[in-house]
Regions:
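Conserved catalytic core of Hanks-type protein kinase domains
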Residues: 36, 59-60, 123
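Acidic/histidine-rich alpha-helical segments that form the ligand environment
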Residues: 89-131, 148-156
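Short Lys/Arg-rich basic patches
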Residues: 15-19
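Contiguous N-terminal and early-domain "leader" segments and peripheral loops that mark the onset or edge
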Residues: 1-2, 115
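Hydrophobic alpha-helical core bundles mediating ligand binding, dimerization, or RNAP-core interactions
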Residues: 23, 27-30, 34, 110, ...
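Short, contiguous alpha-helical
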Residues: 2-9, 20-24, 28-31, 40-91, ...
Length: 174
């Protein structure tokens, strides 16, 4: 009999560890979906207006980095940050293929970001999940709890994973 259970990630406060374990579960599903893809199918778009699978993978990392580093940890975005491979990766859908990024490269970028996220979460307590983080976005002040941010990151990655799986079917890559 198969049994799936979610356990808290070791070294993190219990509830924080459950969120991180859920993030890791979705990441493993994403990794399995793209790890064996060649550069061409990873980088090309399935149809006009679509994003490439590789760009979506890096966008997942960009979102996690922005939420965790800039909002949770309070990092101020620099010009150097904006040179990262994942930054604004969805802005020019047709430009991604020319970069020649491999699946291994894209997943390694995600691993770096995930390690940074884990580093932020290590020192947090159960009570920190209710901490309200206030920031400006698109000229509007926003409040989000850390619990909501972690949930959002799981949901965001899961949605894009589904999009990636759909694109693979459209491109006959299954």
């Amino acid at each position: 009999m198969s049994r799936d259970v979610l356990t808290p990630y070791p070294g993190l406060a219990t509830s924080v560890g459950y969120y991180f374990s859920a993030m890791e579960e979705v990441r493993e599903q994403l990794r399995n979906a793209v790890k064996d893809m060649d550069v061409q199918p990873l980088g090309r778009t399935a149809f006009r207006g679509a994003h490439s699978i590789g760009a979506l993978v890096l966008h997942i990392g960009e979102a996690e980095w922005w939420w965790m580093q800039c909002n949770v940890a309070g990092h101020r975005l620099t010009e150097q940050d904006q040179q990262a491979a994942c930054w604004d990766v969805l802005d020019e859908p047709d430009a991604f293929l020319a970069k020649g990024y491999t699946a291994e490269f894209c997943l390694a970028e995600l691993d770096k970001i995930r390690n940074q996220t884990r580093g932020i979460l290590v020192g947090l307590t159960e009570n920190d999940l209710e901490r309200i983080i206030t920031f400006e976005r698109h000229g509007e002040m926003r409040d989000h709890s850390l619990r909501w941010i972690l949930h959002h990151l799981i949901d965001h990655e899961a949605q894009h994973k589904g999009q990636i799986l759909m694109l693979k079917r459209i491109m006959a890559l299954n």
